[in-house]
């Protein structure tokens, strides 16, 4: 009789124990996901490309993983950065490539389409077109302390540091560096090339 009572008690308690285990597991999982999301938001952000100023490196609709300012402290030549400048497009984020940093001098031969930094012509295999479009800034120009000079890879279809509404960008206006293409946008023929997914150069 006692044995039957024990077995009955075990059967009655088993579902409760299982349910509690599941609830504890779900509680821990939700807590872990919340922590991961908070850390991710502090260290990274996802930005969607709008427009063709970085063509053909980046396409309209590309999803980019961007390191936040916590991880990205010092912009350097060649970095693809995301910045927000109040004087341009109501502070909407812009995506450009760093051409020069503080103390460097930028000059552009618009006829030849060549960019010079400290007198040295840049080898720019990432550009879609030569730099022929002059937007209003007078060159040569020396980059002020705490600032960077940026341009889009689609040089004749980009509003960037050549334009007075953008000019030099204060490094405090830099939101982060684009490091990885998560999901591809579409090209001019509306094709989506998934083999573009990967680290950005």
Question: What label would you give each PLM region?
Answer:
Residues 1-201:
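Extended hydrophobic leader/signal-anchor segments used for secretion and membrane insertion
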């Amino acid at each position: 009789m006692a044995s039957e009572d024990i077995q009955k008690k075990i059967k009655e308690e088993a579902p409760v124990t299982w349910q509690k285990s599941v609830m504890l597991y779900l509680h821990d999982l939700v807590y872990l996901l919340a922590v991961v999301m908070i850390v991710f938001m502090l260290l990274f952000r996802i930005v969607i490309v709008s427009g063709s100023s970085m063509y053909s490196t980046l396409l309209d609709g590309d999803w980019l993983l961007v390191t936040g300012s916590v991880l990205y402290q010092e912009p350097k030549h060649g970095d693809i950065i995301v910045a927000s400048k109040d004087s341009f497009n109501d502070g909407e984020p812009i995506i450009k490539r760093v051409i020069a940093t503080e103390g460097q001098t930028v000059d552009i031969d618009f006829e030849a389409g060549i960019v010079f930094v400290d007198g040295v012509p840049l080898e720019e295999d990432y550009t879609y077109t030569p730099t022929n479009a002059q937007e209003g800034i007078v060159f040569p120009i020396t980059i002020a302390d705490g600032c960077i000079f940026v341009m889009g890879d689609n040089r004749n279809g980009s509003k960037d540091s050549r334009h007075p509404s953008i000019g030099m960008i204060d490094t405090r206006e830099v939101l982060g560096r684009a490091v990885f293409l998560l999901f591809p946008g579409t090209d001019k023929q509306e094709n989506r090339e998934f083999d573009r997914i990967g680290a950005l150069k």
